[in-house]
Amino acid sequence: MLSAGVDSKDLSKRGESLIRQSSNRYLTTVRIAFRAKQRRFDDFDGLLEESSVKPVQRAIVELSDEQDQPDLLPG
């Protein structure tokens, strides 16, 4: 999903897209923060592979992918 780093232009476009398509900016920001916190604890517990991508960056990419490609979600 993510390489050693994240392109800053791509990351900003994904973040802008999340905010633009959201009905509530605050809730979107909270979702990103909550997901980043989960990923940070997953990294801490060793559940995720070692990565140089920061949890907030990973959260933005994951939420953007879920928004753009809902057919990838289980269920």
Swiss-Prot record:
Subunit and partners: In cyanobacteria the RNAP catalytic core is composed of 2 alpha, 1 beta, 1 beta', 1 gamma and 1 omega subunit. When a sigma factor is associated with the core the holoenzyme is formed, which can initiate transcription.
UniProt keyword annotations, A-Z: DNA-directed RNA polymerase, Nucleotidyltransferase, Transcription, Transferase
Organism, scientific name: Synechococcus sp. (strain CC9605)
Reactions catalysed, as given in the entry: RNA(n) + a ribonucleoside 5'-triphosphate = RNA(n+1) + diphosphate
Full protein name: DNA-directed RNA polymerase subunit omega
Entries under HAMAP family matching the protein: RNApol_bact_RpoZ
Signal sequence bounds: none
E.C. no: 2.7.7.6
Superkingdom of origin: Bacteria
UniProt function note: Promotes RNA polymerase assembly. Latches the N- and C-terminal regions of the beta' subunit thereby facilitating its interaction with the beta and alpha subunits.
Family: Belongs to the RNA polymerase subunit omega family.
Cross-referenced Pfam families: RNA_pol_Rpb6
Enzyme superclass (EC): transferase
Keyword set includes Amino-acid biosynthesis: no
Cellular component terms per the entry's GO annotation: DNA-directed RNA polymerase complex
GO molecular function terms noted in the UniProt entry: DNA binding; DNA-directed RNA polymerase activity
Gene transcribed to yield this protein: rpoZ
GO biological process: DNA-templated transcription
